[in-house]
């Protein structure tokens, strides 16, 4: 990838095609840029904008410190959750300056009952392993902060514009709080638009669902109609990606998000194939790509974002019982070896070993249940 700090990013996707990502493309895809236009077809959402500079700094700093529960009266979590860092005092100082911001978040939670947070572009899906609900569902202010602080996706949002010429003067970070919906991942679809033509639709979740086969043509027809009625001529870019959700009874399409038409956007179809699809060609036939049954136990058969949640050995082991057992045995052998090296301290170390193995098991189970 070629990174031009003054303007754009470019990626060569095949021998003849280069895609360009501009700052304007990114800005057009941030939530507040499009939500008002599509509000009637998007789940209920509240946007807190602009975010206080102290809150942005709080998200940017390493470590996790949450507001004192007794001070905020938000939720039943312990008052402070910490991961020690050299900048802990500075991080704590940011938290202490957010007393006026906490009630704004709480007000939206009170309105909706539960919320799913995101920043301008990204949702902290990679951090749900740390959530008690194993999802992005938040019922307290601390739930929201913990997810945002634990997410690599959110950290990326905070620096994304720096690689494209910097942050515009009129730009501000925003906290998006969507009313919580218990989404069935099988019913989420990603739609690719090139030159204002819908060129491909794919399943978003990387697992096989047999029931989707019978519904494929119905979903494709509904998505195509939705595109022509609401999206085709209204989004500012001519090429882009949008996500939809079609819950039971499958009679309404909900717009969930917009993404750039660029390889940084995940796709089940190779980008070298996507850029060569031509909806104006007489031979073109729009298709909805579903995960094939044969791929169910292959590389696609995993939960989205699992690589971001816990170490890869745990992710891999969670998909294979024998691998899980072997991983835990290996850890036990290593701990036993360390016990032997420490001599008289072996007994104390042995107590810790049990906790360590139990924690690894819990982490693996969390990964395997990702939604």
From Swiss-Prot:
The keyword Lipoprotein does not apply. GO terms for molecular function: ATP binding; magnesium ion binding; protein folding chaperone. Keywords: Cell cycle, Cell division, Cytoplasm. One of its GO terms (cellular component) is cytoplasm. GO terms for biological process: cell division; eukaryotic translation initiation factor 2 complex assembly. Residues 334-371 are annotated as: Disordered. It holds the Pfam family D123. Its main location: cytoplasm. PANTHER family: CELL DIVISION CYCLE PROTEIN 123 HOMOLOG (PTHR15323:SF6), D123 PROTEIN (PTHR15323). Belongs to the CDC123 family. This is Cell division cycle protein 123. The gene is CDC123.
């Amino acid at each position: 990838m070629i990174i031009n700090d003054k303007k754009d990013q470019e990626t060569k996707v095949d021998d003849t095609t280069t895609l360009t990502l501009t700052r304007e493309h990114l800005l057009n895809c941030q939530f507040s840029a499009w939500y008002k236009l599509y509000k009637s077809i998007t789940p209920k959402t509240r946007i807190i904008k602009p975010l206080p500079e102290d809150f942005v700094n709080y998200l940017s700093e390493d470590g996790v410190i949450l507001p004192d529960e007794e001070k905020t009266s938000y939720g039943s979590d312990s008052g402070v959750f910490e991961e020690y860092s050299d900048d802990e005092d500075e991080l704590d100082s940011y938290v202490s300056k957010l007393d006026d911001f906490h009630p704004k978040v709480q007000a939206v939670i009170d309105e909706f009952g539960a919320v799913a947070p995101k920043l301008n572009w990204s949702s902290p899906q990679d951090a749900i392993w740390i959530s008690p609900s194993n999802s992005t569902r938040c019922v307290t202010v601390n739930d929201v902060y913990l997810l945002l602080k634990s997410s690599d996706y959110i950290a990326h949002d905070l620096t994304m514009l720096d690689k494209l010429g910097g942050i515009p003067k009129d730009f501000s970070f925003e906290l998006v709080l969507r009313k919580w919906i218990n989404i069935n991942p099988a019913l989420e679809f990603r739609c690719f638009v090139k030159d204002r033509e819908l060129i491909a639709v794919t399943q978003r979740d990387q697992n096989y669902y047999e029931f989707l086969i019978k519904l494929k043509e119905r979903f494709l027809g509904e998505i195509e109609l939705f595109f022509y009625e609401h999206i085709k001529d209204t989004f500012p870019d001519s090429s882009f990606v949008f996500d939809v959700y079609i819950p039971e009874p499958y009679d309404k399409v909900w717009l969930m998000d917009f993404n750039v038409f660029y390889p940084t956007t995940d796709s089940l179809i190779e980008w070298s194939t996507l850029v060569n699809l031509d909806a104006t060609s007489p031979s073109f036939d729009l298709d909805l790509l579903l995960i094939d049954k044969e791929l169910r136990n292959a590389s696609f058969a995993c939960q989205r974002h699992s690589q971001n949640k816990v170490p890869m050995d745990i992710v891999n082991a969670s998909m294979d019982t024998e691998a899980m057992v072997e991983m835990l045995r290996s850890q036990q052998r290593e701990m036993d070896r360390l016990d032997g090296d420490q001599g008289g301290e072996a007994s104390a170390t042995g107590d810790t070993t049990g906790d360590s193995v139990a924690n690894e098991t819990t982490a693996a189970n969390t990964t395997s249940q990702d939604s």
